[in-house]
Amino acid sequence: MHRIDTKTAQKDKFGAGKNGFTRGNPQTGTPATDLDDDYFDMLQEELCSVVEASGASLEKGRHDQLLTALRALLLSRKNPFGDIKSDGTVQTALENLGLGEGAKLNAATATLGRTGFIAIPVMIGGIEQSVIIQWGWNAAKASASGGDGNTVVFPVAFNNACVAVVANYDNVSAPINAVATGGYTTTSFLLRCAAQTGSYYYNWIAIGY
């Protein structure tokens, strides 16, 4: 591409080396800028190349091909990155951006409170799964033969398995009663304390997937 460079171009009109056009001035003997085939060929090919780069063929009767081509070649503000999806090149785009499998993962979900959970998406072998961490505060009832195993229901069910539950006594005052967990399923576990009388509360945290 080039700016007009005929002998009658207005030299440095837009700055050093940036020629422009002049309509001329007969009173001062300044001629109007001449146009040549080099300049018109440049304009033609610059514009036509944009249309053809979009995959379209030139049509003499159409006057919107340049605009149509620009919309096709540039990202649409109405549907950001929609062209990447429609071209079937999402994977290529992620690779070009240097993003790994994690870029495809959904956002983590959670419920916060005294009892709650967080589900963290992970990619394992190209398959999205979730590591789930849950927590709560529940009672373990005592009995004459030692604490009963109270069933505690998880805030949400694990998709595959619960692998561990850790509990601690929710009181620093004596007596401090030992606690145990067991009987893990995807929906619940057993919480048992060592006391033979009373009812004692324990904090717990569970991990699964």
Swiss-Prot record:
Ranges of compositional bias, category Polar residues: 22-31
Region (Disordered) residue spans: 1-34
Entry superkingdom: Bacteria
Any matching Pfam family: Gp53-like_C
Biased composition regions of type Basic and acidic residues, renumbered to the chain: 1-15
Gene3D superfamilies reported in the protein's UniProt record: 2.60.40.3940
Family, as annotated: To E.coli YfdL and M.jannaschii MJ0347.
Name by which UniProt lists this protein: Uncharacterized protein StfP
Organism: Escherichia coli (strain K12)
Source species taxonomy: Bacteria, Pseudomonadati, Pseudomonadota, Gammaproteobacteria, Enterobacterales
Gene of this entry: stfP
